[in-house]
Structures are given as structure tokens and as C-alpha cells.
């Protein structure tokens, strides 16, 4: 019987994010293109005698109160589904910054679901895990399988796309966050400013054109987020001035990323930026990875 499992929880960016309007349930209808990237957290799950324990590293990493933590939520939702106990100790090693729009919380929940399913031999399908995961976060279903996909609804209705041409991403995040609810509230007050579309990005991916993909990057939430956190706009401008083929904010921010054609250009830009978080990444064709069991 396996006693412990270790997994990679991969971050994501949104190549395009189009807000289609508010929904009666308080969420927003979206059309977006997700892409998994090589930045990741590590989730280690170990069987325990009873209960649930979460240890977050490094000490002081901001993950919020336990009852709002996505790892805890994923565990609770799975125990409710199977109507049984899953006593574990979870160690979460954070590398993906929180409040960045990079899917850190969602990917942690995704890895937790995959890990619990394997550790306890639950034999749930990916489709069942994705359905459970939606209760922990709108991006969890994508983060389970990862790769490249169009997301609709709140992002949970997924259609796979061809992987992008090889490239490097420089991901940067300012110190300040803005908060999803605050961003959407500001967006709703400025309706009519929609500029982004997923169509050029989908076309570029199907044609395998990196230049067209980079030119098509866009996010309807960037203007309002930039008003709340001006560093977002500044980072985007710095990345473009450094020679990026294209740049935009990911998700609800406040992380900004840029596409570069070569690793050398990306590394040079990484060294030149003064943001608190800067990382060179690559697109990857998968979601959660089991490292050890």
C-alpha cells in the first residue's frame, strides 16, 4: 500500500481572456485560452492516522485561512463525494505566487485531487475529478489535465487546442495584488471597453504561428487592473521595450507575462526586471505530474 505521493502542480497563463458578461449566479461568462507553464508548486500527501493537516513551505507563504485554502477545499469535497475518511498530512511547497492570476491555488487543488485519488485507490476518472474540482475553483478542471485549451463558462467547459510553437515566457508580478472580486466589480462599472478576443489566438495555435500568437495576446481585465495596480501596465511596457513579441496580464492578475523567441532574450530580460517575482518559463503539454509514489 502506498503511504506517500509527491506531485507537481503546474501554473497556467491565459493567452487571451474575453469577458462576455455577468451571469445571474454572480460569476462572469468567459471565453479564454489556457496554457500550462513550467512554473510549479510541489504537493506531498502522506497517509495519517486521522484528520487533515496542512503544512505550507516556505514558512510565512501567504495561502490564507485553512477553510479557504484550495487544498483543504479539495480534500473536503472529495471526502463528501466518497462519504468516507481520507486522513492525510499535506505538505505544500509554494513557488507560484498567490494573487497572480497564474492558477496557483487551482493547481494545488488539482494536484491534491489527483494525489488523493492515487493514494487511496479511489479509481475516479479525470472527468469525475474535474467535476469535484470545480467546487474548489473555476480553473481546477483545466489544471488537472493542463496543456492548451479553450475555456468557456467560468472557464470549466474545456476544448483542447494544438500546443503552441516552442517559445519562452518571462513571468513577472508586482508586490501588490488586486483581488478577483474587486477587479470584476471595477470591470462591471466600465462595460463597453471590451477589446480582447480569443479568435486570433485560436487561429494562431491551429496554424502554428508564434508571431500571430504573440500579437493576439490580450485580456479584457488588464485596463481595470492596471488602474488599481499601475505596476501592471509598467511591467507590460518594460517587457515590450525589452523586445518581447507580445505581452499581457494573466487571468485576473497581477502577474504579467511576455513571449520571447529565444531563451537568451528571456534570460536577459529576467535579469533586467526589478519586480519582486520574475521567472523564465516554457509552455508544457500537461497538467498535474506524479513525481513519486
Indicate where each model-derived feature is located.
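ATP-binding N-lobe of GHMP and related small-molecule kinases
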Residues: 1-100, 118, 122-127, 154, ...
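Residue-level signal for inorganic ion chemistry
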Residues: 15, 43-45, 71, 105, ...
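Short beta-strand scaffold segments in enzyme catalytic cores
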Residues: 17, 41-45, 139-143, 149-150, ...
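Short, basic/glycine-rich phosphate-binding loops at helix/coil junctions
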Residues: 50-64, 112, 134, 207-217
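Glycine/serine-rich anion-binding loops at beta->alpha junctions
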Residues: 91-120, 138, 244-260
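Contiguous, small/hydrophobic- and glycine-enriched helical/loop subdomains that border
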Residues: 109, 113-150
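Conserved, helical-rich catalytic subdomain that frames metal- and/or nucleotide-binding sites
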Residues: 145, 150-246, 261-274, 279-293
Amino acid at each position: 500500500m502506498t503511504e506517500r505521493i509527491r506531485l507537481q502542480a503546474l501554473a497556467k497563463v491565459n493567452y487571451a481572456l474575453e469577458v462576455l458578461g455577468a451571469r445571474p449566479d454572480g460569476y462572469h461568462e468567459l471565453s479564454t485560452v489556457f496554457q500550462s507553464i513550467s512554473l510549479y508548486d510541489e504537493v506531498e500527501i502522506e497517509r495519517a492516522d486521522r484528520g487533515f493537516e496542512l503544512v505550507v513551505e516556505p514558512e510565512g507563504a501567504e495561502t490564507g485561512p485553512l477553510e479557504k485554502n484550495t487544498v483543504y477545499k479539495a480534500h473536503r469535497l472529495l471526502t463528501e463525494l466518497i462519504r468516507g475518511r481520507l486522513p492525510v498530512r499535506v505538505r505544500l511547497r509554494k513557488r507560484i505566487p498567490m494573487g497572480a492570476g497564474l492558477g496557483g491555488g487551482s493547481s494545488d487543488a488539482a494536484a491534491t485531487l489527483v494525489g488523493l485519488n492515487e493514494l487511496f485507490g479511489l479509481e475516479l476518472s479525470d472527468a469525475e475529478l474535474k467535476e469535484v474540482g470545480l467546487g474548489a475553483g473555476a480553473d481546477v478542471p483545466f489544471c488537472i489535465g493542463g496543456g492548451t485549451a479553450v475555456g468557456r463558462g467560468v472557464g470549466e467547459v474545456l476544448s483542447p487546442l494544438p500546443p503552441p510553437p516552442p517559445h519562452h515566457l518571462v513571468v513577472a508580478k508586482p508586490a501588490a495584488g488586486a483581488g478577483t472580486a474587486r477587479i470584476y466589480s471595477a470591470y462591471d462599472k466600465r462595460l463597453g471597453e471590451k477589446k480582447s478576443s480569443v479568435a486570433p489566438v485560436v487561429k494562431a495555435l491551429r496554424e502554428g504561428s508564434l508571431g500571430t500568437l504573440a500579437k493576439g495576446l490580450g485580456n479584457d481585465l488588464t485596463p481595470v487592473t492596471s488602474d488599481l495596480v499601475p505596476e501592471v501596465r509598467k511591467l507590460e511596457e518594460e517587457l515590450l521595450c525589452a523586445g518581447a513579441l507580445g505581452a499581457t496580464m494573466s487571468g485576473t492578475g497581477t502577474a504579467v507575462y511576455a513571449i520571447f523567441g529565444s531563451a537568451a532574450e528571456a534570460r536577459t530580460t529576467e535579469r533586467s526586471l526589478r519586480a519582486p517575482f520574475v521567472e523564465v518559463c516554457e509552455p508544457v503539454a500537461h497538467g498535474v505530474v506524479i513525481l513519486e509514489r
